[in-house]
Amino acid sequence: MANKIGKIIQVMGPVVDVDFEDYLPAINEALEMELEVEDKKIRLVLEVAAHLGDNRVRTIAMDMTDGLVRGMEVKATGDSIKVPVGEEVLGRIFNVIGDTIDEGEPLQAKTYWSIHRSAPPFEEQSTKEEIFETGIKVVDLLAPYKKGGKTGLFGGAGVGKTVIIMELIHNVAYKHSGYSVFAGVGERTREGNDLYYEMKESNVLDKVALCYGQMNEPPGARNRIALTGLTMAEYFRDEMGLDVLMFIDNIFRYAQAGAEMSALLGRIPSAVGYQPTLASEMGRLQERITSTKKGSITSIQAVYVPADDLTDPAPASVFAHLDATTVLNRRIAEKGIYPAVDPLDSTSRMLDPNIVGEEHYKVARGVQAVLQKYKDLQDIIAILGMDELSEEDKLTVERARKIERFLSQPFFVAEVFTGAPGKYVTLEETIEGFKGLLEGKYDDIPEAAFYMVGNIDEALEKAEKLKAK
């Protein structure tokens, strides 16, 4: 039996070199040590990243390396980082090594899985093209999500990314009675904290597992936290045969942390200073997010675009993997239309008559055509006013304004601060409503009736009330 105890020979920030006498730990193997910080015992995990020769390894620390000195003992575990999986993880917050950090009861998990896993083989992958109904009108109609697909959620600060994420978690929990996993990758601690309490208030916490690797943590933790969350989601898919929703906020920070790790390990950087392995790292993560014949993982990934440059290598490496994009627009939020999804910028591979059907496709393209025409006419309206438009254009503008308002909808998770009860709208109801609007069935109804309602029947009810007033 080889001696699995090694000694620290060098510490460079989050990178630690360890020397073993007669044992060589494998790449990605977890090494453990106990540290005393302010009279508290802390389990520090180091992950092997490179072999330096002569039984020496270079490792990345999953926590702060304050207090480490040369000569300290490190124990090899003989395995990679393992995290708890199964229904026990729901409603709890985890760090990268699978320890709970919500100060709750000790975790009673029966099963632990390694965070480094292979993507499912080709023969197990499902090739069905199916829509994932979210209950959010603008998404289901114009840029539908693929079941087991990947969607990028693009938006600046304060346009409602987190609210959409919470609404999706709510709708999955109640309509599909499914589970969700949320991985906060390089998140602000405050946002993670807010999300936890908001979920608690809106009663969705017991259907979701939260994994946080915040901004203040070393790059190892910020990079690997995405794998921790994904492993929990994979268990629900493979062992329980469920359709899981996986949220990653923010996928850019995953690439960013990888770049930091790469530089610390002394690798030569590639374009814009990113790691030379950016595409393969991203591919390894994204290939695990897929549908199998047992279940599916549908992922929604928030994408931060540095300096609004879509050609930056990090966001560009994400684009290749996405099936749909949901773009949030501040101009729409300023009009008071929530969710502030841009109906003309958001795209989906699923919006194809062979997948969604002829009717859905025609209605969606019709809605986009009317909104595009309205956008083109806005300059004329701003300079000359509505009166200068032809009768046909006036009608287009009126319909477009109604469509714009009908694309808004009250959210369940926003009930607390809007006072309006949330609405889940099925795909059939969504198509029926917009089809009627395009055909001119509702031309005599005031546009105020379409604002913040669910299906078309509610808009007609609201119109009756407005008339009565």
From Swiss-Prot:
The keyword Membrane applies. Its EC number is 7.1.2.2. SMART domains: AAA. Keywords: ATP synthesis, ATP-binding, Cell inner membrane, Cell membrane, CF(1), Hydrogen ion transport, Ion transport, Membrane, Nucleotide-binding, Translocase, Transport. GO terms for cellular component: plasma membrane; proton-transporting ATP synthase complex. Gene3D superfamilies: 2.40.10.170, Bovine Mitochondrial F1-atpase, Atp Synthase Beta Chain, Chain D, domain 3, P-loop containing nucleotide triphosphate hydrolases. It is a peripheral membrane protein. Its main location: membrane. The keyword ATP-binding applies. It is found in: Cell inner membrane. Belongs to the ATPase alpha/beta chains family. Produces ATP from ADP in the presence of a proton gradient across the membrane. The catalytic sites are hosted primarily by the beta subunits. This is ATP synthase subunit beta. It comes from Nitratiruptor sp. (strain SB155-2). The lineage of its organism: Bacteria, Pseudomonadati, Campylobacterota, Epsilonproteobacteria, Nautiliales. The gene is atpD.
